[in-house]
Regions:
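Conserved nucleotide-state-sensing and coupling region of NTP-binding domains
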Residues: 153-214
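N-terminal accessory segments
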Residues: 1-117
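ASCE P-loop NTPase helicase motor core
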Residues: 240-310
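Nucleic-acid-processing active sites and adjacent nucleic-acid-binding tracks
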Residues: 370-372, 396-432
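ATPase catalytic-site recognition across NTP-hydrolyzing enzymes
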Residues: 309-382
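Walker A/P-loop
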Residues: 116-137
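Two-metal-ion RNase H-like nuclease active-site motif
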Residues: 207-211, 375-387
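Conserved RecA-like ASCE ATPase "motif II neighborhood" in helicase/translocase motors
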Residues: 192-254
C-alpha cells in the first residue's frame, strides 16, 4: 500500500533527524524530499552534509551536498550559482569568493523572480562583478522558463556582444559549468549578428535578445520576461552634456521601455552618474508620480568604501579590491581635482551632489567689460564647506537678460572663521 504524502513527510523528517549522525539516513531523507518536490528542507540537508564532511564523510557527503544544490538550483538563484560552478576550483569560481558581499544583490534578484518586486536598481563600482552576476541571473531565468523573451540593452554593441558571449560560454562549456545538470534545456539556435539565443525551440521573439540603446529596438523583442538595462551612458563626457542625457532618456522612454509587455520585470544597473541620467529619471518618476504608487521597486547601491572607510569588495582568494586599493583610487581622483567622478563611479552618488565637473571648452568667457547699464539681477551663490579639506565656493553673479557674468568668486578651503568674513566682504562690495 502506497504511503500518503503526510506519511512521506513524517518519514522525511525522521530520516533527516537520524541524518545528524547517519549519512545514509540523511541521503534517504533527501531522496524523499526530492520525490516530494520539497525545496524547504535543502538548507538543513546541506548543513548536515557539511558536518559529515568535516567528520570525514568524504565523497558521499560531497555528492549529497552537490545533488542538493542541483535539486534546489531551479528554484533558488544562490543554489543555482553554487551548483553551476561546483566542479571548478574555488579560487577560479565567480560566485563563492564574492558570495558574502554580493548576497544582498542576489537576494534582491531572487525577490524579483519570487514576485515580490517589479523593478530593481543596482549600482556598484567598476569590475566588482555586476555584469557577470547578471549573466548568471539571466541564464537562471532562461532555464526556468525558456519561453519567456528577455532583453539586454547597453549603450554600445560591443558591450552587448560581450554579454552575449558570456551567456554562450556557460551554455556551451559543460566541462567547466554544470548548467545541463540543473536545467535540461538545449540551445535551439543562436545568431551572433543579431545577438539572439533560443533555448528549446526557435521562436519569433528569442529567449535572449541583445541590443544597444542606439540600435534597432523597435520590433526586435517583445519582452515578457526581464529587461536588463546595463550602463546606458558611455561616461563622463556624455554626462556633461544635457542634450546627450536627454537623448539617452528619450531612447529609453520611447524605444526601450515600450518593448516590455505587462508583467515583464526591469533591472537597471550601472554607474549613478547624474541626477538627470536614465536611472535617476526613472527613480524620480516612481517616487513622485501617483500612478506608480503600487509599483514595487528597490534600490541596492553598494559603495566601494563603507562608512568606516573600509572596502565593501575585499573578496576571498584575492579576486576583489582592498581598502588600500580604493583609497588609492580616491587619492588619484582627489589629486586631479575630480572627486565628483570618484563619488559617481565608486560610491554611487551622482556628480551634482559632490560638485559638478565642467569642461573648460564648454564655458564662455568675457574680457572683463560688462554690458552697458545696470544688471537685471545681482546675486551670490554659496556652496559652503563642512571641513575635511573641502572648499567654500561662492561666485558673485551679474545677470543681463539670459546671460550670467561671474565678476568675482570666493574660493577657499579655510575654516569658517576665514571664509565667513570673505563672504561678508563680497556681499558688501558688490551690494548683493
Amino acid at each position: 500500500m502506497a504511503m500518503t504524502v503526510e506519511e512521506q513527510k513524517k518519514l522525511e523528517r525522521s530520516l533527516i533527524e537520524r541524518g545528524k549522525t547517519d549519512l545514509a539516513a540523511l541521503d534517504d531523507g533527501f531522496e524523499i524530499a526530492r520525490l516530494l518536490g520539497d525545496h524547504e528542507i535543502g538548507n538543513e540537508i546541506r548543513k548536515l552534509a557539511m558536518e559529515h564532511l568535516r567528520k570525514g564523510g568524504g565523497a558521499d557527503a560531497t555528492m549529497l551536498y552537490h545533488r542538493s544544490l542541483i535539486f534546489d538550483g531551479p528554484m533558488n538563484f544562490d543554489c543555482f550559482m553554487r551548483a553551476l560552478e561546483f566542479n571548478r576550483p574555488v579560487n577560479e569560481q565567480f560566485w563563492l569568493p564574492r558570495r558574502k558581499q554580493l548576497m544582498p544583490i542576489s537576494n534582491a534578484l531572487q525577490d524579483m523572480e519570487d514576485g515580490k518586486l517589479d523593478e530593481l536598481f543596482l549600482s556598484q563600482p567598476p569590475r566588482t562583478g555586476k555584469t557577470t552576476l547578471m549573466v548568471m541571473f539571466l541564464l537562471w531565468i532562461m532555464g526556468r522558463n525558456s519561453e519567456r523573451s528577455n532583453l539586454y540593452c547597453s549603450y554600445t554593441d560591443s558591450v552587448v556582444g560581450v554579454f552575449y558571449n558570456g551567456l554562450l560560454e556557460i551554455l556551451n562549456d559543460s566541462y567547466t559549468y554544470a548548467y545541463g545538470d540543473i536545467f535540461q534545456t538545449k540551445i535551439a539556435s543562436t545568431n551572433a549578428k543579431d545577438l539572439l539565443i533560443n533555448l528549446e525551440r526557435k521562436k519569433r521573439y528569442a529567449s535572449f535578445t541583445g541590443r544597444s540603446l542606439y540600435g534597432t529596438l523597435n520590433g526586435a523583442c517583445d519582452c515578457n520576461g526581464y529587461c536588463i538595462a546595463d550602463d546606458l551612458h558611455s561616461g563622463i563626457e556624455e554626462i556633461l552634456s544635457a542634450d546627450r542625457l536627454k537623448s539617452a532618456w528619450d531612447k529609453v522612454d520611447n524605444n526601450l521601455i515600450p518593448r516590455l509587455k505587462m508583467g515583464a520585470k526591469m533591472v537597471w544597473e550601472g554607474t549613478r552618474w547624474s541626477i538627470a541620467d536614465c536611472i535617476a529619471r526613472r527613480i524620480d518618476l516612481l517616487e513622485n508620480d501617483q500612478k506608480y504608487v503600487d509599483h514595487r521597486w528597490k534600490v541596492v547601491n553598494v559603495p566601494a568604501l563603507d562608512e568606516n572607510d573600509e572596502s565593501n569588495f575585499n573578496y576571498s582568494y584575492g579576486v576583489g579590491f582592498s581598502t588600500e586599493y580604493f583609497q588609492q583610487r580616491r587619492a588619484s581622483f582627489e589629486h586631479n581635482n575630480d572627486m565628483s567622478s570618484w563619488y559617481a563611479q565608486y560610491q554611487g552618488s551622482p556628480v551634482e551632489r559632490n560638485g559638478m565637473v565642467f569642461e573648460p571648452g564648454g564655458m564662455r568667457y568675457y574680457n572683463g567689460v560688462l554690458p552697458d547699464g545696470e544688471p537685471d539681477r545681482k546675486f551670490i551663490a554659496v556652496d559652503p564647506a563642512y571641513g575635511g579639506g573641502d572648499y567654500t565656493a561662492a561666485p558673485v553673479v551679474y545677470q543681463y537678460g539670459d546671460d550670467l557674468y561671474i565678476v568675482d568668486v570666493v574660493f577657499d578651503n579655510g575654516e569658517k572663521n576665514v571664509t565667513q568674513p570673505q563672504l561678508v566682504a563680497a556681499v558688501k562690495k558688490y551690494d548683493v
